[in-house]
Amino acid sequence: MEKDPPDCIIADSVYPWVYDLARKLQIPTLSFNGFSLFTVSLMESLRINNLLHSHTDSHSDSGAFVVPNFPHPITMHARPPKSFTGFMEIMLEKELKSNGLIVNNFVELDGEECIEHYEKITCHKAWHLGPTSLIHNTVQDQAERGNKSVVSVHDCLSWLNSKRDNSVLYICFGSICYFSDKQLYEMACGIKASDHEFIWVVPEKKGKEDESDEEKNKWLPKGFEERNIEKNKGLIVRGWAPQVMILTHPAVGAFMTHCGWNSIVEAVSAGIPMITWPVLGDQFYNEKLITHVRGIGVEVGAIEWCVDGVGEKENVMSRDIIEKAMRRLMDNSDEAERIKQRARDFREKATRAVQKGGSSYNNLLSLIDDLKRMRDNKTLA
């Protein structure tokens, strides 16, 4: 890079050493961290006020507190463990050495107020260029996004095509969040009690060929899967599912999610309201944007922060709580209809954002102009 330096480096924030190298070589850098600006801005507010860190390495601190000096009144019920915040603090500090932050989101979802707050407290610029899931949006693109699905795309589509609009609950907790057998069992009981049709994505190891009935009955009620297959009421997908394709199908009415940012952006882009169940990392902050600020989701009520998303939590969410959260969005109440309408409104805003003249489209043009200026200024220097 010293002999033939690029005009700019776009650096993933998990590689903080890139910023020091770029500064040494006088190469402009842009950061990308995969979070919403709402979350980055909130974490910066916590960091400035010495509220980012927990007092322990392995567990989160309990106890509610209001995030100070933030554009929205956000109450957090715990602080994450040091193992998460220590890394985040390094990442946030390194990002501020870059020439700006690229965000996979659109202005209307994060909100002008959060953008102004971020730029005020950091003196750092952010470019909203998403949602990227709307840029390549054919059925083939949706089916191929991510890893190879363990379920046939054709079979999944055929099953969804047989269902009424807004009748299916999609349940998925990403690729790094794993629940204990006890929690999965309670989840299955909550699904059964809600009496709604569903697609439930579980870890690939669940249901492996050598899994005994005894092992299976630890995480699924006896006969649960067989009854749902027989009644054509639900699908259990082991491993990776074609999520974008599922979310954009008219049969899907709600999404129970761990609040990973990619999942949230994909749901918002599809106009699907969410049942939020955060587990670790930025997910608890993302939940606040979706439920408290934008009103396009309801909370299960999780407050226990995990270190790595694997293993048992101290508290198991009961089937009654899970059923109640599912029914809030799936039972067609007045509250559910208001939430669904707001979700549809944000789908339209997301679609407009990436079209010509939209906020993300214009931000991309602005970023290109800024990159040209950085290149020209470097040449003149």
Provide a role label for each language-model segment.
Residues 1-250, 254, 268-270, 279-381:
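Nucleotide-sugar-dependent glycosyltransferase catalytic domains
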Residues 260:
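Aromatic "clamp/platform" in nucleotide-sugar-dependent glycosyltransferases that forms part
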